[in-house]
Amino acid sequence: MADMDYLAARLLLLSGNPFCGMPKASEAIEKIMKLFLVVEAKISRNEELSAKELKKYSHNLINLADKVETICPMQLRGEWKKHLEELQKSYDMRYPDKWANKMEWKSDIDNLDSIYAYLRQNISKNFPAEERPTADRFGGNIISAYNDEIVEKIEEAGMLSPINLLSKKNKQRDKFNAP
């Protein structure tokens, strides 16, 4: 689901709709970090994280990034922390009671592509060597949920296929494990 949310966020942002695209991007980043926590608990400690345990992180990207970094050292600070804060702000502003008199939406698709590609690539690489083959399945082909029949129907309807959507204006395209 994280990959589908990421592709949906790209589509919305490329279509000039940051009001929906940025919260969807936030959800994609949240889901991939929570997925890491679930996979890490299962592989490293043979624990099943419950929905309740995951909910304690709420939708707070900064808290999630902090938790992920305590488990596997990554570079989620600096400019990316600012981007995570922008995504968090956009997620919080989904409802009118959170709107300010002047809303600013900073939609930087290049940053979204960079951080999402980085998370997908590096989370599994930070598992211990003996656990990496199992963790690598986590960062598999980004469009694997779409079989040939689904892609054909998407294209017949005149829509962008997932691979075309992933490739459109994406400087990080080569970092995704996709055909």
List where the protein language model places each region.
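Long, charged low-complexity segments
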Residues: 41-179
